[in-house]
């Protein structure tokens, strides 16, 4: 008796479901593991490293030094919250009003796309996913964001974010950035230094902390004003983030 042939669409559907199931197990395990274990590298770091090698840049090294929140200046945590996600302590991974505003803006200005990703979303993307703006990646990002918001504390999310965020070419994490740009550990970053590092986060490969443009300087000044308005270090203590 000949075996029944499986229709191509059925085969592809089953294959896709198996791949998604495997990814769910992999990512779920990663979320559980990295809730307590330092993150050795991120998907973005791996992507940058592989791209460099494929381009013949064999001297490129995606560098990161993991540090705990106790070894990071409270100004640094406050600076990235101020710059990227001021509602970070309040939401469950998504800033819905900001998303609605971004969608309305993008409909009117297709040439200048505005994002509304929270720190939680950026952490999920940087840690587990590839660069890009596809709806598939956005969907996966949403699921991963819910995962880390459910399993991790806000302090843990911020700690991981600060250790894997890209601050320049091959520079990942606030410790590597502090050593490269200011020749000091992240624990000793001042208000202005923290604000400068946060100011380049929209595009750290375009904006340079070691050669800040007028835009970066104005953004740095805005971040410092906003940090004061949020309450300075007391904001971090009040929200159990340091």
Curated annotation (Swiss-Prot):
Name of one Pfam family that matches: Transgly
Membrane topology summary: Single-pass membrane protein
Main localization of the protein described in the UniProt heading: membrane
Transmembrane segments: 19-39
EC number(s) per entry: 2.4.99.28
Record-level GO cellular component terms: peptidoglycan-based cell wall; plasma membrane
One function term, GO molecular function aspect: peptidoglycan glycosyltransferase activity
Cell location: Cell inner membrane
Gene3D superfamilies with a match to the protein in the record: Biosynthetic peptidoglycan transglycosylase-like (1.10.3810.10)
Keyword annotations: Cell inner membrane, Cell membrane, Cell shape, Cell wall biogenesis/degradation, Glycosyltransferase, Membrane, Peptidoglycan synthesis, Transferase, Transmembrane, Transmembrane helix
Keyword Membrane: yes
GO biological process, one term: cell wall organization
InterPro entries membership: Glyco_trans_51 (IPR001264), Lysozyme-like_dom_sf (IPR023346), PBP_transglycosylase (IPR036950), Pep_trsgly (IPR011812)
Family stated for the protein in its record: Belongs to the glycosyltransferase 51 family.
HAMAP family on file: PGT_MtgA
Functional note: Peptidoglycan polymerase that catalyzes glycan chain elongation from lipid-linked precursors.
Protein name: Biosynthetic peptidoglycan transglycosylase
Annotated organism of origin: Salmonella paratyphi A (strain AKU_12601)
């Amino acid at each position: 008796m000949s075996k029944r042939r499986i229709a191509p669409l059925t085969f592809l559907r089953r294959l896709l479901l198996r791949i998604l199931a495997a990814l769910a197990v992999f990512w779920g395990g990663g979320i559980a593991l990295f809730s307590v274990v330092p993150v050795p590298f991120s998907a973005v770091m791996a992507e940058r490293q592989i791209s460099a090698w494929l381009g013949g840049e064999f001297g490129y090294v995606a560098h990161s030094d993991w540090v705990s929140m106790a070894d990071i200046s409270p100004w640094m945590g406050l600076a990235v919250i101020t710059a990227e996600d001021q509602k970070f302590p309040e939401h469950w991974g998504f800033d819905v009003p900001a998303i609605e505003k971004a969608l309305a803006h993008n409909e009117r200005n297709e040439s200048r796309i505005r994002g509304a990703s929270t720190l939680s979303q950026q952490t999920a993307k940087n840690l587990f996913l590839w660069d890009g703006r596809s709806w598939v990646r956005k969907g996966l990002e949403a699921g991963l964001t819910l995962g880390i918001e459910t399993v991790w504390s806000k302090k843990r999310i911020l700690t991981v974010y600060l250790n894997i965020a890209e601050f320049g070419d091959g520079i990942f994490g606030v410790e590597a950035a502090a050593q490269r740009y200011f020749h000091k550990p992240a624990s000793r970053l001042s208000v202005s230094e923290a604000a400068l590092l946060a100011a380049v986060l929209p595009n750290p490969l375009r904006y340079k902390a070691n050669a800040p443009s007028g835009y970066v300087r104005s953004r740095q000044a805005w971040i410092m004003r906003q940090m004061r308005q949020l309450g300075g270090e007391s904001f971090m203590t009040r929200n159990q983030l340091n």
